[in-house]
From Swiss-Prot:
This is Serine hydroxymethyltransferase. It comes from Acaryochloris marina (strain MBIC 11017). Catalyzes the reversible interconversion of serine and glycine with tetrahydrofolate (THF) serving as the one-carbon carrier. This reaction serves as the major source of one-carbon groups required for the biosynthesis of purines, thymidylate, methionine, and other important biomolecules. Also exhibits THF-independent aldolase activity toward beta-hydroxyamino acids, producing glycine and aldehydes, via a retro-aldol mechanism. The keyword Transferase applies. Homodimer.
Length: 426
């Protein structure tokens, strides 16, 4: 039976070659970017399906186009599975991305010029939580909070003081580079004091929430957004969830027709597949290993003398503060790339460097845990990272680390069903 790559090789060898080379890169590299993961073959199959052919503006049972009976069935399945997975009363599975989901929520709950609170990007927040370069920072008055300078963790008393002073209409919690448990109940208490909405963006930790390895925000938050990839291990896309049915209807309108047109039903079907996978017992086991592996990586790097932001991690990611070894995040990112490790430079709290340089390296465990690696392999990964960063100019160390990476990758194959040879690029 022909794979999608086989078909592409026959019809468009140029793009087939690019795809095959990217597949080989993913196979040959240690993927440690915290926001990346490897979907199952089933998710890939659903996303590359005939559902891409169908326009389906509206919601299941309320479409503006005919011929949507099977589209409705797929989307409703995604909705029902997401409700079961997170314990939500209302779910919209149509946002094309987490950023789209967040913008739809802002459009629903805020008016231009309203004040909201979100975490500073340099402390672990996200662009869509009020960065001045994002629409969230252009349309609204943003009060940013950060972490405590000593613990490098959230200080809820300080956040409360800011909230009482500025009285925002909404508080956003949930982050892109925060390695610790978030206390949603404390955020709820703060929001209630000022009669504010509470929004949680769990894009990074959604899989951990679904599996019980991180507290669920839904009992405490008015609305929860997430992406469907990262720790949830689905296709790239967004999700909006709430326990409030009336608010849910408003979010639906802000997605369509407010910010989007036709939904990507092939992606929604792939979301349904991923949610179904996440409802199975082995997904809980997987997420447990994700946390164990991240903690192992942090501990082993600490033993090699590296400073870890907040002194560890409770979730899937960790931040390495490189100032102690006189290296920038940009330099470290480039250095680990030389030995076929993919990571990303990242600001650390109170970072003196620009976002284009940074003082930190963000590392995550989800992707390589998906490939089957455990604490023994993550111990070796930590030592490879330490060896190559501590001796950045040593060619022998570079070659040794590259070979150790190759050995690890060969033991844990990726997508073995995709076996097409690499076609020549033209």
């Amino acid at each position: 039976m022909q794979t999608s790559l086989d078909i592409l090789t026959e019809t468009d060898p140029a793009i087939a070659g690019i795809l095959q080379q990217e597949l080989q890169r993913q196979r040959d590299h240690l993927e440690l970017i915290a926001s990346e993961n490897f979907t199952s073959a089933a998710v890939l199959a659903a996303q590359g399906s005939v559902l891409t052919n169908k326009y389906a503006e509206g919601l299941p049972g309320k479409r503006y186009y005919g011929g949507c009976e099977y589209i409705d069935a797929a989307e409703q399945l995604a909705i029902d599975r997401a409700k079961e997975l997170f314990g939500a009363a209302h779910v919209n599975v149509q946002p094309h991305s987490g950023a789209q989901a967040n913008f739809a929520v802002f459009l629903t709950l805020l008016q231009p010029g309203d004040t909201f609170m979100g975490m500073d990007l340099s402390h672990g927040g996200h662009l869509t939580h009020g960065s001045p370069v994002n629409v969230s920072g252009k349309w609204f008055n943003v009060v940013q909070y950060g972490v405590d300078p000593n613990s490098e963790q959230l200080n809820y008393d300080t956040i409360r003081e800011l909230a009482l002073k500025h009285r925002p209409k909404m508080i956003v919690c949930g982050y892109s580079a925060y390695p610790r448990i978030i206390d949603f109940e404390k955020f709820r208490a703060i929001a209630d004091e000022i009669d504010a909405y509470l929004m949680a963006d769990i894009a990074h930790i959604a899989g951990l929430v679904a599996s019980g390895h991180h507290p669920n925000p839904l009992p405490f938050c008015d609305v929860v957004t997430t992406t469907t990839h990262k720790t949830l291990r689905g296709p790239r896309g967004g999700l909006i969830m709430t326990k409030d049915l009336e608010l849910g209807k408003k979010f639906d309108k802000s997605v369509f027709p407010g910010t989007q047109g036709g939904p990507l039903e092939h992606v929604i079907a792939a979301k349904a597949v991923a949610f179904g996978e996440a409802l199975k017992p082995d997904f809980r086991d997987y997420c447990g290993h994700v946390v164990e592996n991240a903690q192992t990586l942090a501990q082993q790097l600490q033993e090699r003398g590296f400073k870890i932001v907040s002194n560890g991690t409770d979730n899937h990611l960790l931040l390495v503060d490189l100032r102690s070894i006189g290296m920038t995040g940009k330099q470290a990112d480039q250095r680990v790339s030389q030995v076929n490790i993919t990571a990303n430079k990242n600001t650390v709290p109170f970072d003196p460097e620009s976002p284009f340089v940074t003082s930190g390296l963000r590392l995550g465990s989800p992707a390589m845990t998906t490939r089957g690696m455990g604490t023994a392999e993550f111990t070796e990964i930590a030592n490879i990272i330490a060896d190559c960063l501590l001796k950045p100019e040593d060619a022998a160390v570079t070659e040794d680390c590259r070979q150790r990476v190759a050995n690890l990758c060969s033991r844990f194959p990726l997508y073995p069903h995709l076996t097409s040879p690499v076609p020549a690029l033209t």
